[in-house]
């Protein structure tokens, strides 16, 4: 009985659209309904396919892979805590995002929702990071405090500055006021990723050959991984934090919503949910989760390695994390 090698994805990950379609599988909220029994069955299906007990790569195998990829961490092979799986990203962030987008929050409200947002960010960054290098509890606590302080500082500062921009019209001030949460979220989100994954930058992350064998740790690979993740966070936040408030401003001028103010929050939540579901896979797909790179872009120790066949290694891989 011959063994089978399971492809990394059902889709072509060398293309943006292929990565988006793969991300749609990973972020599909329906996978959250999978039970422990479903997960165990999916793992066994993949093992049976790898062992050659299942000959054909059909939809049953692909569905099993979808459950496994959306539930287990690629490094530890352990289930990610459900609220912080990428398939739960939209649902977990929904309440926090809606809270931050409320107009006229005031200082206390701004601080509270930025604190909530960064707490969720810390949890997602920690749960989905590259696990070859991990933060200690004191390091995580310090990074958490830094990220929360930065986001609150940016948000409060912008809330104070915008009303004082007397050269702007009242409508322009209103638009900037609605976009203040985005500036805070984007800047703090980048800082959060770099702080929560700072140990990866200091120690490096595991780099692998095409057979999955570790070749050692690379700080340069870590910089690529963390930098791309931070950028994807900004790309993801942009439509979510910009489109709903601007559309809502437009809708609030319509008679049907102006005469029914109680519908404002449900409409806002609907806009946020729809935008989030569309934006998340588009943002994740910008960069491959399993990044391939020339060893000559890394440290000298990776430049002239050879594989088991004594052939030069011309491409290495690392897990970027989500």
Curated annotation (Swiss-Prot):
Protein's UniProt keywords contain Hydrolase: no
Superkingdom field: Eukaryota
GO cellular component, one term: mitochondrial inner membrane
Membrane topology reported for the UniProt record: Multi-pass membrane protein
Keyword Iron-sulfur included in the entry's annotation: no
InterPro entries recorded: Mtc (IPR004686)
NCBIfam families xrefs: mtc
Function text: Mitochondrial amino-acid transporter that mediates transport of serine into mitochondria.
Family: Belongs to the sideroflexin family.
Protein name: Sideroflexin fsf1
Organism, scientific name: Schizosaccharomyces pombe (strain 972 / ATCC 24843)
Organism ancestry: Eukaryota, Fungi, Dikarya, Ascomycota, Taphrinomycotina
């Amino acid at each position: 009985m011959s063994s089978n090698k399971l492809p990394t994805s059902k889709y072509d990950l060398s293309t943006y659209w292929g990565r988006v379609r793969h991300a749609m599988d990973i972020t599909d909220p329906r996978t959250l309904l999978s039970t422990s029994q479903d997960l165990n069955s999916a793992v066994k299906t993949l093992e049976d396919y790898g062992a050659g007990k299942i000959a054909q790569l059909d939809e049953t195998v692909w569905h099993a892979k979808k459950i496994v990829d959306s539930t287990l961490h690629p490094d530890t092979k352990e289930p990610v805590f459900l609220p912080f799986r990428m398939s739960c990203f939209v649902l977990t962030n929904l309440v926090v995002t809606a809270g931050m987008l409320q107009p006229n929050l005031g200082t206390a409200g701004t601080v509270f929702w930025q604190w909530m947002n960064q707490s969720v960010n810390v949890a997602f960054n920690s749960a989905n990071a590259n696990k070859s290098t991990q933060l200690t509890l004191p390091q995580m606590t310090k990074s958490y405090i830094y990220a929360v302080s930065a986001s609150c500082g940016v948000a409060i500062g912008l809330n104070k500055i915008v009303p004082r921009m007397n050269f702007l019209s009242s409508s322009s001030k209103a638009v900037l006021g609605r976009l203040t949460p985005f500036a805070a979220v984007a800047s703090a989100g980048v800082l959060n990723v770099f702080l929560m994954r700072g140990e990866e930058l200091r120690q490096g992350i595991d780099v692998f050959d095409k057979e999955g064998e570790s070749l050692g740790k690379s700080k340069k690979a870590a910089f690529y991984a963390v930098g791309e993740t931070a950028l994807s966070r900004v790309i993801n936040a942009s439509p979510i934090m910009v489109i709903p408030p601007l559309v809502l401003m437009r809708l609030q001028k319509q008679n049907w919503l102006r005469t029914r103010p109680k519908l404002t929050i449900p409409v806002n939540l609907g806009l946020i949910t729809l935008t989030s579901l569309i934006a998340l896979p588009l943002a994740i797909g910008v960069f491959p989760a399993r990044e391939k790179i020339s060893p000559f872009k890394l440290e000298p120790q990776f430049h002239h390695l050879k594989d088991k066949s004594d052939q030069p290694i011309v491409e290495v891989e690392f897990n970027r994390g989500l």
